[in-house]
């Protein structure tokens, strides 16, 4: 990513607008296209236990549960559930829209749920179209859904 810091005057009328005081552009790394990965590390030694790679960088947060699961919502719209010890993919679902927000887990009525915000639209989303084309070019922008799954006990 290339970033230029600029002093700008915030736009306040007719309503406040985002002003981060910088412009940025995502550019591919010099050694090839940008990719993403999730790696699990031993917390004591730092040794890599396992790694999963993605065609594009996932933009959403990662969720680890006490039940030994790791959830990763990827940029293409697929939610992956992995075994935290081995990295084996246990489950996945295509939500039809990219993910770029936080995933959470909660308990209600004695049952555990995972809630995944889905939708495509942000400063970064526009840059993904320029870098990767499809499927991001065809994704509806500024849409959203909250998709909730229950976990088996």
How would you label these PLM feature ranges?
Residues 5-59, 63-153:
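Extracytoplasmic/lumenal domain signature
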